[in-house]
Amino acid sequence: MKEKVIEKTIEWAKVITLAICMGLIVTYFIVPTVVSGESMYPTLNTKDYLIINKLAYKTGNPNRGDIVVFKTDLKSSDGEKKSLVKRIIGLPNDHLVIKSGQVYINDKLIDEPYLEDTYTAGDIDIKIPSDSYFAMGDNRLVSKDSRDSDVGVVNKNEIVGEVSMRLFPFKEVGTIG
């Protein structure tokens, strides 16, 4: 009888320890996010369920082409601050120009094979600050991103993490890249 109580206690301790570990992982290392809107189409679709790696940029920096989640001062329909999912286009100290529907970084036209429509609206000429990034959606015609003064450049401190994986829809489960 005493052995069964000890056995049950050990099993419960394992379950509780596992639950605490999972809670810590979700709290400090990853965060789930659901895509809202079509601004990252065709790479991401509305209602895609994503996993964000919160540790990705604790020791390193975002690279051009990374898809990130960042905080903004924009408000959602329920009045909460809104986070956006966008692609890093410009890096700190880059000279970014958008003219005639094309994006230039440091006087070179950039190749963006992930775009379905390559036209990029806007008339922008900016030197990106040393602690900031220029982020845009892949669906440039509908994306509210760094081209918009309500969003602007993204300070590294505002970046929540890198999109590392899509969990839903199931037919598209896998890494994002």
Predicted regions and their residues:
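PP2C/PPM family metal-dependent serine/threonine protein phosphatase catalytic domain
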Residues: 101, 105-121
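Protein maturation boundaries and topogenic segments
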Residues: 1-83, 154-158, 162-177
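Solvent-exposed loop/turn segments at secondary-structure junctions
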Residues: 56-58, 74-76, 96, 103, ...
